């Protein structure tokens, strides 16, 4: 089976067919999903989705786009909310210098607050880093000097240096459908180089659908295609990638539980032999 550790099931693209989205994921062999928070104040929405489906979990946190809106929420409130049994992660939080909907200062403050919450709870932090490799690395190094914390660089599109620094700090690196894009040659080289026991896969659905669905609404079932791209880059089988990334997920997301009924991975979904 595979895990999609980062999707946004509360987004309007899924409002009319969420049960169908979940069913298609299972049919493709995706047994566990994590719906990711972008606003702490929408906690009840994420919680409701997770509580309605046995194998869906959720996170608590503020996306860097929205950092300026929720700086009034203290770290201890994130810690308190994270105690829900199906809340398995903190975030997503981090730095986005591409859009900068929040100031860099607000993003950095929010990032550090979420790191503190991850450190206190032991839950992994879902890190968003776009066009901000240098500052992301600087904050990670600075914060690790104050105490280690579990984390993953989600939807990784950064450079080799950031990926290697993250792994050196004990973090994980996650690849999305971007990995399958024609121009992502350098990213595929990074996916081939990193230790397999530090790699995760995700969709970031409804965005960034992998080839051959690029330009369409992404959904968790399509994580199979990203996993196949990792396998191709490393010259190993999809089954090996699925096994490793699933084990990695449950090692990092310690509150998540493996599904009672493990769906069979549909290798043919990617055209693999």
Per-region residue spans from a language model:
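Mid-domain alpha/beta scaffold segments of enzyme catalytic cores
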Residues: 1-273
């Amino acid at each position: 089976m595979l895990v999609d550790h980062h999707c946004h099931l509360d987004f309007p693209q899924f409002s009319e067919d969420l049960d169908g989205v979940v069913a298609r994921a299972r049919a493709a062999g995706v047994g566990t999903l994590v719906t990711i928070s972008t606003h702490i104040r929408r906690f009840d929405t994420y919680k409701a989705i997770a509580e309605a489906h046995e194998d869906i979990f959720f996170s608590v946190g503020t996306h860097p786009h929205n950092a300026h809106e929720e700086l009034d929420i203290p770290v201890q409130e994130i810690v308190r909310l994270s105690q829900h049994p199906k809340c398995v992660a903190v975030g997503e939080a981090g730095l986005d210098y591409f859009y900068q909907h929040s100031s860099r200062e607000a993003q950095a403050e929010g990032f550090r607050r979420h790191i503190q919450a991850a450190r206190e709870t032991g839950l992994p932090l879902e890190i968003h880093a776009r066009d901000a490799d240098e500052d992301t690395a600087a904050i990670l190094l600075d914060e690790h000097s104050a105490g280690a914390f579990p984390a993953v660089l989600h939807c990784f599109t950064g450079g080799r240096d950031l990926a290697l620094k993250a792994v050196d700090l004990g973090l994980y690196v996650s690849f999305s459908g971007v990995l399958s894009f024609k121009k992502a040659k350098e990213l595929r080289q990074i996916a081939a180089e990193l230790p397999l026991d530090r790699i995760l896969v995700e969709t970031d659905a409804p965005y960034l659908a992998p080839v051959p669905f690029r330009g369409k609404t992404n959904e968790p079932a399509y994580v199979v295609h990203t996993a196949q791209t990792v396998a191709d880059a490393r010259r190993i089988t999809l089954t090996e990638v699925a096994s490793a990334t699933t084990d990695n997920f449950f090692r990092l997301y310690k509150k998540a539980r493996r599904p009672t009924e493990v769906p069979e991975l549909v290798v043919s979904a990617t055209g693999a032999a």
